Structures are given as structure tokens and as C-alpha cells.
């Protein structure tokens, strides 16, 4: 289950990053989405995802943030903290 | 020319790879003490751009020694063409920190473990080894004084890099992947991303992994026929500052100090390339007399007329002139680089001759060499004594063409050349040149097997089952050097001599060399009591000129595959030796087993 679909600008941009990283233009992620919900979301693509998010928002996560993100919602919160 | 090395773009390209039937395959084993998986899509995508299909074996994490030292390992079962060894300085740093004693022997011990891996691979495989060196570490314990402390980490890494180069020089089967160059080029504070080392053992910052992959691919492609053989130069505001037609030979800017120093530096760089064996040609919109004047009259010029193999100055369009240069040199468009300050000319050549490599040059001539260097256009995997003579070979060839034009008949011309040919089994002194010809020849090449130096050595030593021959040609104008390779294998059971490889330098076509060699091959089959000679043709995108090679000599087509491969057979009794104007040097028995 993907939970609530994203609507805000940030959430939309995050979703686009997911679509590019996982090469799936139909992919829709929500705050509750975890790695288990997305095909090919493994430790390698996780790094690709972090690199792509950092580039999109011109931010830099700490090692702990990269490790501890539990779902897309936490990713969005982390982005908001950095650009806010 | 733009090389897109965007990380996510390459990942996307890798997902979209759909190889066409018949795409040549490269078997690459990747071993290292860092995350290797990340490299797979990048290597696949870059090889796909070069029209190769990469089959990649991924070694276990930090499993290089285990795989290399065990003859039964999955590495050797994979039968790789190339073994890529990646060693991260981050991993070296861990070992340095956790060393049991003092660090005075750290570099030497690390090096001997590396050379042991190389030499073990050499015993169990003919694969080419590509060994990375180390990015200089970012840690400083003593500050600048680190370099005065031989056992410090920075001093150890510097020494290790030097020793890797030295040990590789004495082993033709080891090529160096200069990671330190890449890291310095980018800047080490950006190169290292310690987060991703901690989390995933990423070799460097992930966005920079494509640079490492490109370096590896450049090296491998240089062992597979990709080579820049000629640099074509514009003159005004490319090779010197100013316009020769307006400023005159003394008015242009070209001098070692002061005005035109940046052009002087470019010319020095080009002269180094020429000394290395890369041909220089001029393609300029000018009156010919004006264009050559600075070469003859301006003492500031580094390049002399004798450094230029083909000089074309006229008012025709540059694409037509580059085609003339290509014909004169008999090389492929994809082995030519065109340098011109004028964006109009660059775009015209890109449009009309898309295979020619046309680097984008910056507005400021001071940055030309940097822009050219960034592209790594001149990668090579071999170096032979003949390289330095290459410009001379072509210059002498021009004299032959004049002789040909003035001779009463082609036969008379061939006779007047007084050609001498020496055919012999591969010998150790020639192996570098032999491996180079095998790696560079694309057009006159019947099967395009890209043997490594190690393969050539194995064939040389296999006196029972392999007849690996090289031919060297000279004539009254000068020496051509080693210009042809034929590998044949006697099959006593089938009663035939099998030609597995036949390739020649395009410098010596239509001289009768191939006729002479075929005479010798048939003679050799006779001598061994073999009643038949068989051969194979494997088509590539470049060797169309030899599609009918065997038919020319009266071979019958025995087989044709859907992919265009053909097999041919000739009854030796039915062969009439071809008339040639070549005089044999050396003894016939020199090639026999």
C-alpha cells in the first residue's frame, strides 16, 4: 500500500526523482512507502536515490540520515529540514 | 564532441541496452576491495556506446587475492579477456592504521602482494590486467613534513604509486589505470565522499564513478582497435595567433616567450604526440605558399614541415580536404582528430564526417591543451620502437607515390622499388610491435582476433601446433618495418593448414605482400605434406576490403553463416604461385617448426 499520494511541490519533485532513479514513469510514492514497496530499491539504488535527491535539492545528508531513513516520509522531512 | 558522463544518465543507458546480433563481446572480470556492483551498469553503458557488449564477472568483496591465487577459482572459469583490479586508498588506509608494527615496510609489502596477484594471474590466464593506482590520501599527520617521513601514509602511497608504475613497465600484461590522475584532476576534496565509503564502500563520490569507468573503458578499447592515428590541424588562430594571409610569416604570434606562448605550448604538445607515433596533418583555408611560409621562415615555430605528414592548404571545404588526407594515409575517419578554433569549421566537419573526432575548443587558446587532455584521446596499450619512425614511414611513402606516378607501368614501378621481405616466426624482440599491430589493425584484418602480448608469447612458444609469422618489408626508399602478421595452425588429422589470422598494415597494400605471403603459406603446407589450406573471414564494420580475399586466391567457399562469416578451402595442388617483385631475406627454414 502506498498510503497518501503526494501533492505538495517538494513531494512532487521527490516523486519525479524516484521515477528517474527507478526508471518507471508510472511510479507513485507516498509518505508511507518503504524500500519493500518499490521493486529494485536495494542498497545500491538507495545510494543512487540519495545522490539524485541531493542533486535535485542541492543539499547534503549526513551519514546517519542516509542510514536511518525508514520511509519516504522521513526522506521528505529531512529535505524540509535542510531547505527550510 | 561531448562525452556525457552523468551518473544517472549512464544508469539509464545501461537499462536500455539491447545489443544487436553479432555485437562483439568482451569478457571482463572486475576484482577489488571496494563496491564493484556500482561499476557494472557504468561499464556496460560505456561499452555499449563503443558498440561492444560487456560480459562482466564481479568478484567477491576484497576477494582479489583469493581469486587470483587459486587456479580453480570462478575468476579463471570465467575465462576473462581482461581482469580489472581496483584498489581503493580508503581500504589501504584501514590496513595502514591497523598495521601490527611500524610502517616502514608498509609500501613494499603492499606492492609485493599486488605483484604476486599479477604474476599468479599471468600463470593461469592470458588476460590483460588493468591495475589501478591510488588516489593520494587526504589525511596529513605531520602536515607538509609527511613527505619527509618515509613511513607516513602520504609518503607510502606516493612510493607505492611509483613502484606500481615501475613494476608494470617490466610486465607487458599489466596496464595501469591512473586513478591518481583522475582524483587530482577533479580535486581530492570532491573525489572522496567518506559517507558513501562508510555506507557502501563506494570507490569515490558516486557521481565521479563514471570517470573511473571511462578510464577503464578507454584502456580496454585501446587493446581493441581504437586508436587516434592522426591529428589534423587548422593553422590561423589554432597553431599560431593571427592570420598568415594578413600578418605574414613574421607577423603571426608564435614564440617561446611573450606573444604566442600559448600556441608555442600547443605545438610542443603536438610534437610530443608526433614523436610518439601520431601523425600530424594540416588542413587550412589558405594559399599553399602562405601556409607553408611560417614553417620554413619563422624561428618561433616548433613544428617543421618535416613533422607534417600531409599538408593541405586550399579554399575547398574542410570535409573534402579531410577526406583527401584520409585517402593519403589510408586510415579510418574514427582514428582522426580535427583541431580548429573556428566553430563553423568544427560543425561542418561534425556534420559531414560524423566519425571524425572533433573536440570543442575553448575560446582562449591558453586552454587548448587542457581541453584536449580532458578527453583522453590518445590512449594506447602498446609502445613499439617503430612508433617514433611512423611520420618518416609516411613521408617516404609519399616519395614512392611520386615514383609510382612517374613509372611507365605499375609493374615497372614495383620492380624499381627493390623490395625485400623477411618472414619469420614471432620473436621476443618483435612481440610489442606484433601485439600493437594486432590491436590497431582494423581494415586489412581477416578475423580481428585481438590477442594480448601474453597470447602472442604463447603462440610463439607453441612450435608444434602454431605457426605465427610476421613479415617485415623494406625497399630502396627505406624501411617499412613489421607490416604483416599471419597465424596458421597445421591440422595433421584433417591434412590442412588453417589460417586463423591474417592482417596487414594498410601502408603496404598493392605491393604484392599478400601474394608473397600466400605463396609462402601454400609452400609451407606442401612442405608439411598438408594437401589443403583453409581460412576464415569474420566480418566487422571495418574490414569489408578483405571480404573476397580468399576468393582472389582461388579458394572455394566452404561455408557461409547468417552473420556473414565465411570459411574457405584451397587444394594446394591447384594453386599457382603468384608473381611478385619481392626478394626473400632470411632462410625458409626459419619459419618451420
Where are these regions (language model features)?
Chain B
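Serine-esterase "nucleophile elbow" of acetyl-processing enzymes
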Residues: 1-59
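Alpha-helical cap/lid subdomain in secreted, periplasmic
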Residues: 18-25, 42, 50-59, 64-207, ...
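Short hydrophobic segments within beta-strands
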Residues: 29-31, 132, 234, 283, ...
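A short helix->loop->beta-strand "cap" motif at the edges of active sites that frequently abuts
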Residues: 122-128, 277-278, 355-356
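Alpha-helical substrate-recognition element adjacent to the catalytic core
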Residues: 230-232, 236-320, 379-431, 435-439, ...
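Conserved Lys-Pro-Asp/Glu-containing loop-to-beta segment of HAD-superfamily phosphomonoesterases
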Residues: 322-343, 349
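Terminal substrate-recognition subdomain of acyl/acetyltransferases
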Residues: 328, 350, 354-417, 523-593
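Acyl-donor binding region in acyl/amide transferases
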Residues: 476, 482-561
Amino acid at each position: 500500500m502506498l498510503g497518501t499520494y503526494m501533492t505538495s511541490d517538494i513531494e512532487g519533485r521527490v516523486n519525479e526523482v524516484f521515477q528517474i532513479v527507478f526508471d518507471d514513469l508510472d511510479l507513485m510514492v507516498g509518505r508511507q512507502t518503504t524500500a519493500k514497496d518499490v521493486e529494485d530499491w536495494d542498497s545500491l539504488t538507495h545510494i543512487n536515490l540519495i545522490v539524485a535527491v541531493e542533486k535535485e535539492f542541492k543539499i547534503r545528508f549526513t551519514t546517519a540520515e542516509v542510514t536511518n531513513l525508514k520511509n519516504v516520509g522521513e526522506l521528505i522531512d529531512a529535505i524540509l529540514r535542510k531547505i527550510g | 564532441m561531448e562525452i556525457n558522463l552523468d551518473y544517472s544518465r549512464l544508469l539509464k543507458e545501461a537499462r536500455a541496452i539491447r545489443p544487436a546480433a553479432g555485437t562483439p563481446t568482451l569478457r571482463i572480470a572486475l576484482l577489488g576491495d571496494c563496491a564493484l556492483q556500482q561499476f557494472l551498469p557504468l561499464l556496460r553503458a560505456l561499452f555499449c556506446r563503443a558498440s561492444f557488449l560487456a560480459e562482466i564477472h564481479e568478484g567477491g568483496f576484497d576477494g582479489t587475492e583469493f581469486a587470483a591465487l587459486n587456479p580453480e577459482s570462478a575468476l579463471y572459469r570465467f575465462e576473462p579477456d581482461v581482469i580489472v583490479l581496483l584498489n581503493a586508498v580508503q581500504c589501504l588506509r584501514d590496513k595502514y592504521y591497523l598495521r601490527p608494527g611500524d610502517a616502514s615496510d608498509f609500501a613494499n609489502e603492499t606492492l609485493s602482494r599486488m605483484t604476486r596477484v599479477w604474476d599468479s594471474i599471468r600463470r593461469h590466464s592470458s588476460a590483460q590486467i588493468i591495475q589501478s593506482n591510488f588516489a593520494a590520501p587526504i589525511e596529513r599527520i605531520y602536515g607538509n613534513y609527511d613527505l619527509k617521513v618515509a613511513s607516513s601514509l602520504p609518503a607510502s602511497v606516493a612510493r607505492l604509486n611509483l613502484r606500481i608504475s615501475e613494476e608494470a613497465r617490466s610486465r607487458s600484461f599489466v596496464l595501469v589505470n591512473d586513478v591518481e590522475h583522475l582524483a587530482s584532476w577533479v580535486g581530492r576534496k570532491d573525489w572522496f565522499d567518506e559517507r558513501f565509503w562508510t555506507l557502501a564502500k563506494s570507490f569515490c563520490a558516486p557521481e565521479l564513478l563514471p570517470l573511473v569507468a571511462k578510464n577503464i573503458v578507454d584502456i580496454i578499447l585501446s587493446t581493441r582497435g581504437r586508436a587516434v592515428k592522426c591529428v589534423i590541424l587548422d593553422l590561423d588562430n589554432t597553431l599560431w595567433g593571427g592570420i598568415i594571409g594578413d600578418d605574414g610569416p613574421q607577423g603571426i604570434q608564435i614564440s617561446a616567450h611573450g606573444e604566442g606562448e600559448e600556441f608555442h605550448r600547443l605545438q610542443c604538445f603536438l610534437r610530443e604526440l608526433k614523436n610518439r607515433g601520431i601523425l600530424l596533418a594540416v588542413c587550412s583555408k589558405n594559399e599553399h605558399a602562405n601556409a607553408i611560409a611560417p614553417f620554413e621562415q619563422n624561428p618561433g615555430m616548433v613544428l617543421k614541415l618535416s613533422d607534417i605528414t600531409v599538408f593541405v592548404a586550399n579554399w575547398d571545404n574542410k570535409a573534402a580536404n579531410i577526406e583527401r588526407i584520409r585517402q593519403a594515409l589510408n586510415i579510418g575517419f574514427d582514428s582522426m582528430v580535427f583541431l580548429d578554433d573556428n566553430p563553423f569549421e568544427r560543425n561542418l566537419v561534425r556534420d559531414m564526417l560524423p566519425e571524425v573526432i572533433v573536440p570543442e575548443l575553448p575560446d582562449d587558446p591558453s586552454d587548448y591543451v587542457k581541453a584536449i587532455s580532458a578527453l583522453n584521446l590518445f590512449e594506447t596499450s602498446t609502445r613499439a620502437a617503430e612508433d617514433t619512425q611512423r611520420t618518416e614511414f609516411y613521408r617516404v611513402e609519399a616519395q614512392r607515390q611520386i615514383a609510382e606516378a612517374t613509372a611507365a607501368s605499375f609493374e615497372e614501378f614495383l620492380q624499381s622499388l627493390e623490395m625485400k621481405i623477411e618472414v619469420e616466426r614471432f620473436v621476443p624482440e618483435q612481440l610489442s610491435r606484433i601485439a600493437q599491430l594486432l590491436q590497431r589493425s582494423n581494415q586489412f584484418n581477416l578475423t580481428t582476433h585481438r590477442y594480448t602480448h601474453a597470447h602472442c608469447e604463447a603462440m610463439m612458444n607453441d612450435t608444434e601446433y602454431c605457426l605465427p609469422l610476421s613479415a617485415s618489408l623494406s625497399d630502396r626508399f627505406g624501411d617499412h618495418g613489421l607490416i604483416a602478421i599471419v597465424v596458421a595452425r597445421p591440422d595433421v588429422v584433417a591434412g590442412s593448414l588453417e589460417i586463423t589470422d591474417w592482417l596487414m598494415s594498410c601502408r603496404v597494400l598493392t605491393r604484392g605482400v599478400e601474394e608473397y605471403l600466400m605463396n609462402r603459406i601454400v609452400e609451407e603446407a606442401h612442405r608439411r605434406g598438408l594437401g589443403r589450406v583453409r581460412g576464415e573471414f569474420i566480418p566487422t564494420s571495418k574490414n569489408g576490403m578483405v571480404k573476397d580475399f580468399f576468393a582472389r586466391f582461388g579458394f572455394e567457399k566452404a561455408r557461409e553463416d547468417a552473420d556473414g562469416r565465411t570459411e574457405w578451402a584451397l587444394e594446394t595442388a591447384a594453386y599457382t604461385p603468384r608473381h611478385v617483385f619481392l626478394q626473400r631475406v632470411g632462410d625458409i627454414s626459419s619459419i618451420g617448426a
